[in-house]
């Protein structure tokens, strides 16, 4: 539990920074649950039950429950902490803090009509312009955070530091859900 304390602090600070861009972010597992704005759905945390002698790589799960019918479906398993928010009543947006060195963005639809979209360092390394790839490959701390959904576009913040960028780098990116295309820019510069 103590090992995740700095990670939880980081998640809480980031969640507070981007609250205005989507519904309020809550940090799981501490939050326990998050209702949709219209009250039709509830995202719940489910602790994984395992013998204390067994080492388990997956510590928690997120489940989406329809409040009217009581039906539920598992969204994902996660390790560490996850900052989760609703975008309108349609999307559940999550930044999963996988370790102290990386995070990834995941988007789920409330109605289950699409597969979840996961955007992480390996995916970005394949789809960003070639001139940006060294920042992803050569830095050992890379964080991908989803801030909001605008129609069919995800707004992301990508940042990190390491050997390539000891003072860090920061991008604002737009990811197209239908095409999988991305555009990124450094704050205060032209799009790349």
What are these model-predicted stretches?
Residues 9-20:
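Bacterial N-terminal signal peptides
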Residues 32-40, 83-92, 143-154:
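Blade-terminus and WD-like Trp-Asp/Gly-His loop motifs, strongest in beta-propeller folds
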Residues 39-56, 90-98, 152-160:
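Short beta-strand elements that form the blades of beta-propeller/WD-repeat-like
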Residues 117-138:
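Surface-exposed loop and turn segments in beta-propeller and other repeat-based domains
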Residues 71-85, 89:
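Blade-loop segments of beta-propeller domains
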Residues 21-76, 181-189:
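Terminal domain-start segments
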Residues 52-62, 101-109, 163-174:
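Structural motif
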Residues 1-11:
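Bacterial N-terminal signal peptides that target proteins for export
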């Amino acid at each position: 539990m103590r090992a995740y304390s700095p990670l939880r602090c980081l998640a809480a600070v980031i969640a507070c920074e981007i609250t205005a861009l989507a519904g309020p972010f809550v940090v799981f597992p501490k939050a326990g649950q998050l209702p949709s704005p219209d009250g039709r759905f509830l995202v719940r945390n489910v602790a994984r039950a395992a013998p204390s002698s067994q080492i388990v790589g997956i510590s928690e799960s997120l489940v989406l429950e329809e409040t009217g019918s009581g039906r539920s479906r598992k969204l994902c398993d996660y390790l560490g902490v996850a900052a989760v928010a609703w975008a309108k009543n349609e999307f559940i947006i999550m930044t999963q803090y996988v370790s102290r060195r990386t995070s990834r963005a995941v988007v789920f639809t409330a109605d289950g009509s699409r597969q979840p979209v996961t955007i992480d360092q390996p995916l970005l390394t394949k789809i960003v312009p070639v001139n940006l790839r060294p920042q992803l490959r050569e830095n050992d701390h890379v964080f991908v955070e989803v801030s909001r959904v605008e129609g069919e576009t995800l707004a992301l913040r990508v940042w990190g530091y390491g050997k390539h960028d000891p003072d860090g780098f920061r991008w604002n990116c737009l990811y197209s859900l239908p095409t999988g295309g991305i555009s990124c820019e450094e704050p205060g510069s032209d799009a790349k």
